[in-house]
Amino acid sequence: MTQFTIASFNVKNLIGADKEYYKFQTYTPEEYAWKQDWLADQLLTMNADIVGFQEIFEEEALQSVIDEASVRADDLNAASVPDRSKRYHRKAIFRKLEVAPYRDAQLAFAPNSADTGEPGQRRPGLAILSRFGFSEPPEVIQDLPEPLDIPFSALRGVEDDAGHFRLRRVSRPILKARIPVGDQIITVFNCHLKSKLGEFDGPGPADLTQYDPMGRALGALRAGLRRMAEAWVLRREILKEIDQGRPVMVLGDFNDGEHAVSSEIISGETPFKNYAWMLRHDAKNSADRYSDAENTQITEDITARHLHSAERLFVRKSARDMVYTTAFGGVFESIDQIYMSRHFHPEFADRIGEMSYFSAFNDHLTDGSHPEAPYNKLASDHGQIMAHMTLMGGAD
């Protein structure tokens, strides 16, 4: 068996010191050193084999964090792991104490194609770090070769044009990597979908002294449409892999909870209990239902392409009732996700592996909207999540 861990880590605006990433937002050298220190320590604590990072402005800044984590791994191992001359060095507990550095790991960085480098107008990219390397060069998906046109259905009659939504590019890149783990190659997608922050047209809705509720509602609508369209672009890429029989894992900042429409677009439909109860799409009478054979076919077609939430699988098998990766305004929710194809589902007969545990690193999170709560802008405003996976077959 082969064991590995895979994690999602939104680092919150990683860029070097004295560089204005958003308007009037920079890190002093002292702040940058503190942030780098915290990130390296968090990466060391996680000790994940595969990490998807979001909100990376500079590859060099991330590489510095990774290098520092490797140095600390050496120091920690020297202090914690007994010398091999000791008779008890073979005890399993000491294997758990050891932390592998990332010196031999490979890093794939996807810069944001909309990032011009102009101070105050920067756009973040993302990255994947893999101790297993990559079986082929990772692929960046952002500017679409053909615009995505989403037509709206006519509500009455035979209207020629009920309107449509057009998407030419996703707001932040999607990074696709094929990673060799044990005797398998797993396709990993890292994403950061459009946030709920409204997209405002002109200065009016953005000027809070001239509050424009309709303009702000329209901004929220634009953001929601974009996020769901980006989810569909990601879903299209996921299906290309699944339909080739490839195991898939999807991670990142979805900016929505598990049951949001955008997340359900990514995961695909959950099969209905029995399609033989359903009225056929071409029914001629009220008793015209799908057959048992069609029910089996439909269920398999949907199940084969459905992704499963690592968090949900963990909650189902444990007594834990709450995992969260963000806190704001009294709302604690998970908007960072790890999804996986049925190749890793414990009830799938032909599974290649399954998740043994799920970790959430969220002790640093506080709800900054509460006056009594501490808040530190230098740490991440997201919790990190990690799935502990076991593959069947292969060397341990």
What are these regions (language model features)?
Residues 14-19, 197-199, 347-348:
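Short, solvent-exposed loop/turn elements at domain surfaces
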Residues 113, 118-121, 125-182:
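A well-ordered secondary-structure block
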Residues 59, 129, 133-140, 146-152, ...:
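Metal-dependent phosphoester-hydrolase catalytic domains
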Residues 12, 56-57, 192-194, 254-257:
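Catalytic metal-binding/acid-base residues of hydrolase active sites
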Residues 142-164, 194-222:
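Short, flexible helix-coil linker/hinge segments at the edges of structured domains or between repeats
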Residues 217-245:
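A long, amphipathic alpha-helix that forms part
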Residues 1-6, 133-136, 170-212, 394-396:
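Beta-strand-turn-beta hairpins that frame and shape the catalytic cleft
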Residues 1-126, 207-211, 352-354, 358, ...:
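N-terminal, active-site-proximal structural segment of metallo-dependent hydrolase catalytic domains
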